[in-house]
Design a protein with these regions (language model features):
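A generic, lipid-embedded transmembrane alpha helix
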Residues: 32-47, 106-108, 160, 245-249
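Functional transmembrane alpha-helices
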Residues: 8, 118-136, 152, 183-185, ...
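Cytoplasmic-side transmembrane-helix entry/capping segments in multi-pass membrane proteins
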Residues: 23-35, 90-104, 147-159, 230-242
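Alpha-helical multi-pass transmembrane bundles of energy-transducing inner-membrane proteins
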Residues: 98-105, 111-204, 215, 235
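Transmembrane helix-loop-helix hairpins at membrane boundaries of multipass inner-membrane proteins
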Residues: 2-101, 181, 188
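Alpha-helical transmembrane segments of multipass membrane proteins
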Residues: 12-17, 40, 108-112, 135-136, ...
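C-terminal ends of transmembrane helices
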Residues: 11-24, 73-89, 134-148, 217-231, ...
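Juxtamembrane/interfacial segments at transmembrane-helix boundaries in multi-pass membrane proteins
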Residues: 45-53, 86-92, 162-223, 228, ...
Length: 280
């Protein structure tokens, strides 16, 4: 688990400092491969005991391996794609280093969201992944690219603010049972005692969480950022948005869906999620 987080963040710092764009592209691929292999090892090594910040279970291990695999394959395509953008003059060598460094920070944010056992830390990780992709969508610095990046940033900020409010409401629902402190933010502890939480407050919290993280998933009506972000950003980032970032937000929703399912008096979020998915 430590390697899945340390490799991307340490690689990002190194990528930002390296001078040669060819070397940065190769290091990005090597770092992505190492992260993927570390994720695969989670299937065979003994899983760590759930702590206040880190959790590995049957749900997130699939997401982690999928995330690192797509991240690795996309980094291979990125190497040639971004080099071509340098040759055509659309990007400078400085922006190439910036791209590869942001790529690894993005991978760190998404991996952190998947392994987090703290709903507050998970929110921070999703926000980090969002901000890095915003910067990468606008990397061409054209009017259309900057407009797409700003639209993505504004709608994403609205969504993440709603998700933050929903997270706070979950903590408020848990506080009478869990007491003060971080126990009210630890997902495994929340699920164990969710049956005793205020169901009405949990229901309201899920509405905000659904709207907030649903914006990241691309659910209607807050999906307007998707077409422009795909069209104006680099092609590898379009693949990352579809194959990875949307999954991170969906994973967060699934965690809260499980939490509500542990409270028999709360709403059943499944039909709502299916309906909005079909509408979108």
């Amino acid at each position: 688990v430590t390697a899945v987080l340390l490799i991307p963040i340490c690689s990002a710092a190194l990528l930002a400092a390296l001078p040669g764009y060819r070397l940065t592209a190769r290091l990005n691929v090597v770092a992505s491969l190492a992260t993927f292999l570390s994720a695969l090892s989670l299937f065979v090594v003994e899983r760590p005991t759930p702590g206040p910040y880190v959790l590995i279970d049957d749900l997130n291990i699939v997401f982690i391996v999928l995330n690192t695999f797509v991240g690795f394959t996309t980094s291979i395509f990125s190497a040639s794609y971004i080099a071509h953008e340098l040759e055509t003059g659309r990007l400078t060598s400085a922006y190439l280093r910036f791209y590869h460094a942001m790529y690894q920070i993005m991978m760190f944010g998404m991996n952190l969201a998947f392994v987090s056992n703290n709903i507050g830390l998970m929110w921070v990780a999703v926000e980090l992944a969002t901000l890095t992709t915003v910067l990468m969508v606008g990397i061409y610095r054209t009017h259309a690219a900057l407009e797409a990046a700003w639209k993505y940033f504004i709608l994403g900020s609205v969504g993440i603010a709603l998700a933050l409010f929903g997270t706070i409401l979950v903590y408020m629902a848990a506080r009478p049972v869990m007491g003060e402190g971080q126990d009210g933010m630890v997902w495994t502890l929340l699920v164990e005692r969710a049956a005793n939480f205020d169901a009405a407050l949990l229901n309201v919290a899920f509405v905000f969480l659904f709207l907030g993280y649903g914006t990241k998933v691309g659910l209607a009506p807050l999906h307007a950022w998707l077409p422009d972000a795909h069209a104006e950003g680099p092609t590898p980032i379009s693949a990352v948005l579809s194959g990875l970032l949307l999954n991170v937000a969906l994973y967060a929703l699934l965690r809260f869906k499980i939490l509500l399912a542990a409270n028999p008096a709360s709403i059943a979020p499944g039909p709502l999620m299916v309906t909005m998915g079909l509408v979108s």
